[in-house]
């Protein structure tokens, strides 16, 4: 009797390729040989061609989604949208809340929710997960993408479109983010998720100079780590019309475009696509007038196309019933609606300026294709990081988390010195001195409704070395009206009484002193109405205000240093005499 273990690997692979990928867990648990085989070869390829395999976010959790496209017809009476299935992901990802997900050839990049500074890259086929820490927990208005260079080194792009810069994390060679400047056009708006194709990332963008909505395509090359030029779309439209980007079998890009007033829908597919060049052909054009109640949302929908059947499947939310719905549209304008599931907390939305952006719960720009990409172990990165820390300066830039000292004797800067605490971009801190003997730093932490103040003082301070001790820690929740600005305000401390006095200007321009003690004692003293008290300057798009309060020391110390008004003139005279003397010596030498 022939046993499964007697079969050749090629025959076993041929058999297992006919098993649905949803049964992969059962296959791996059945036989050690099959488990090893599945970690080195991609199975289930035959079944994947007949199924749509994707992912969706519901209630901030990741779910797998599967249904069969094999029997879909192009008439209204066909009912072959077979076996739709949505199941929760039962692994470590289910322990965190997820707001956004981005797909790249078998890998998922997940952005965690609630101001977490963690990203997760997940390979569903191998079951591998890689946690990545960002520089800060700022995700509002940030666009992400996952891609790779010519050597298949995977990288993460973190794109701050309106700020004009971007960050890159190389998953193979570093544990840090590199910052770059070089956006093709200042003021680009790019809040939609992009599409990954051949390792590059592409985005629909909106510019300030052209008031026609998503008016161009922007490509990013992970090999050169640069954006390409703005590429034109195959159609023109205004700001109230809908555009959406998708990927076709990892070979082409597709754009879905729906006009606002006529509800005419067009789908265009690329015939050539590179970060620096693009050409288009029309795939589908449908007059949606009989279905005017159907309006796709460019902030919350996604779609994919089937070139063989010439259909487009759009995933969106039925606004009347708040359900996840798949709309199947053919070349003749037929429409089929499939209710996938009831939406629970369907969208993560954020207000940026005067517009509210919603992030799609659907991650279905193309059908999932398994990947054999393996992540380097975190322990390996930690070992490398420890070696680098002994050879390099501190480069963590999560806010102002270091001190830089200038030595006027050597006329040089010292080393970058770390502060004794970590904080996020929402926290504020400011520097002071104590009787010109020590440094003090005050940090104000913002965590939900809990606000806390800490005061640290130096035990030792030199241009190249420092050490700290905690002087005061106060829960500031009972006095929530107190706010201080790290750019405008100042403070000093009294070591004997163990109090700290903050000087600040409130919203009505009143200079106020806040006296805070170790037992949460608080007293406010109105100093005076600060008329025209602040000197401000505009740098780029931001206005910086300089504090009128100069109280970084506990008291003024008199000085006998005299200001030499003639020092500059005397140096100039000496320099002139020296040049004249040198000139005379040269003339005498010639004679």
Curated annotation (Swiss-Prot):
Region ranges (Disordered): 567-591
Domain of life: Eukaryota
InterPro entries per the UniProt record, alphabetical: A_thaliana_F-box (IPR050233), F-box-assoc_dom_typ1 (IPR006527), F-box-assoc_interact_dom (IPR017451), F-box-like_dom_sf (IPR036047), F-box_dom (IPR001810)
Domain F-box, residue spans: 2-49
Coiled-coil region list: none
Residue spans of biased composition, Basic residues class: 567-581
The name this protein goes by in its record: Putative F-box protein At1g32140
Origin species: Arabidopsis thaliana (Mouse-ear cress)
């Amino acid at each position: 009797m022939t046993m499964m273990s007697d079969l050749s690997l090629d025959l076993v692979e041929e058999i297992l390729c006919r098993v649905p990928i949803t049964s992969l867990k059962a296959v791996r648990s059945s036989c050690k040989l099959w488990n090893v085989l599945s970690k080195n070869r991609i199975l289930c390829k035959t079944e994947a061609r007949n199924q749509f395999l994707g992912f969706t976010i519901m209630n901030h959790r990741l779910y797998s989604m599967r249904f069969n496209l094999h029997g879909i017809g192009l008439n209204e009476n066909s009912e072959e949208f077979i076996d739709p299935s949505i199941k929760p992901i039962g692994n470590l990802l289910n322990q965190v809340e997820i707001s956004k997900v981005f797909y790249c050839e078998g890998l998922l990049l997940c952005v965690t929710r609630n101001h977490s500074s963690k990203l997760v890259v997940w390979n569903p086929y191998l079951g591998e997960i890689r946690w990545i820490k960002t520089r800060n927990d700022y995700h509002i208005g940030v666009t992400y993408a996952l891609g790779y260079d010519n050597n298949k080194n995977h990288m993460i792009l973190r794109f701050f479109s309106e700020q004009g810069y971007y960050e890159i994390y190389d998953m193979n060679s570093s544990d840090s983010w590199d910052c770059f400047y070089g956006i093709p056009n200042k003021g680009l708006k790019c809040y939609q998720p992009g599409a990954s194709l051949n390792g590059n990332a592409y985005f629909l963008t909106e510019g300030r100079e052209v008031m026609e909505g998503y008016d161009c395509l922007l490509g990013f090359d992970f090999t050169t780590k640069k954006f390409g030029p703005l590429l034109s779309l195959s159609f023109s439209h205004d700001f109230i019309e809908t555009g959406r980007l998708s990927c076709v079998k990892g070979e082409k890009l597709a754009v879905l475009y729906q006009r606002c007033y006529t509800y005419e829908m067009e789908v265009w597919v690329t015939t050539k696509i590179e970060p620096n060049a693009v050409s288009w052909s029309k795939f589908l054009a449908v007059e949606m007038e009989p279905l005017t109640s159907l309006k796709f949302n460019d902030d919350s929908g996604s779609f994919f196309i089937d070139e063989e059947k010439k259909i487009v499947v759009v995933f969106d939310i039925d606004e009347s019933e708040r359900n996840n719905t798949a709309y199947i549209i053919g070349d003749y304008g037929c429409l089929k609606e499939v209710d996938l599931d009831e939406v629970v907390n369907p969208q993560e939305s954020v207000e940026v300026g005067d517009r509210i952006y919603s992030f799609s719960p659907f991650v279905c720009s193309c059908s999932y294709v398994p990947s054999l990409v393996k992540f380097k172990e975190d322990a390996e990165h930690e070992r490398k990081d420890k070696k680098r820390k002994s050879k390099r300066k501190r480069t963590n830039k999560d806010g102002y988390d270091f001190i830089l000292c200038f030595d006027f004797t050597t006329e040089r800067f010292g080393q970058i010195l770390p502060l004794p605490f970590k904080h996020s971009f929402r926290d504020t801190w400011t520097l002071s001195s104590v009787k010109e003997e020590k440094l003090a730093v005050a940090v104000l932490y913002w965590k939900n409704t809990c606000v806390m103040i800490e005061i640290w003082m130096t035990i030792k301070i030199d241009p190249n070395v420092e050490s700290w001790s905690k002087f005061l820690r106060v829960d500031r929740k009972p006095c929530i009206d107190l706010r201080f600005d790290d750019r405008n305000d100042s403070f000093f401390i009294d070591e004997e009484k163990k109090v700290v006095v903050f000087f600040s200007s409130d919203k009505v321009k009143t200079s106020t002193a806040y006296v805070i003690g170790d037992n949460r004692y608080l007293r406010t003293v109105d100093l005076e109405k600060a008329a025209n008290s602040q000197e401000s300057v505009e740098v780029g798009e931001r206005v910086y205000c300089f504090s009128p309060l100069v109280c970084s020391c506990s008291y003024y110390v008199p000085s006998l240093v005299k200001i030499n008004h003639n020092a500059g003139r005397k140096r100039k005279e000496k320099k002139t005499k020296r040049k004249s003397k040198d000139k005379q010596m040269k003339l005498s030498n010639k004679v």
